Amino acid sequence: MDILKVENLTKIYGKGENSFKALDNVSFSVKRGQFVAIVGPSGSGKSTLLHLIGGVDRPDGGHVYVDSNDVYARNDTQLAIFRRREVGLIYQFYNLIPVLNVVENITLPVLMDGRKVDEERLEELLTVLH
């Protein structure tokens, strides 16, 4: 079963003669448990692709399906929940919030989503980090 399916994904930045097609009808699928690497030179559309898969930006054409659900059939509120609960993007250069300690950095996304921190899971994570 496909956990991710990208169909004819297109993203254009700018308008008219100043427009730039960052993605042009990109299609692929990923099966559950499969590992994928997205590689290419600077400016080849890797970040744009990931932003569209993760619901950070909206495509100009095409579809993204995560677990058979169309990511862009959601409204903005539903997309925000999707980003918080269903996908995660880790950038090459990520930053922790320097004024927060380790526990606060780990629990911040859960608290921002209005959920209670699972103390048992937190202890497991801290054990791994230690």
Residue ranges and their predicted role:
Residues 54:
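Helix-to-loop junction immediately C-terminal to a conserved catalytic motif
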Residues 39-41:
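The feature captures the beta-strand-to-loop junction immediately N-terminal to the Walker
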Residues 1-3, 12-25:
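A short, flexible loop at the N-terminus of ABC-type nucleotide-binding domains that lies
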Residues 62-70:
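Conserved ABC transporter NBD signature motif
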Residues 17-20, 71-88:
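ABC ATPase NBD coupling module
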Residues 69-70, 117-130:
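Conserved ABC ATPase "signature" region
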Residues 100-109:
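Short coil-to-helix segment of the ABC ATPase nucleotide-binding domain corresponding to the Q-loop/switch region
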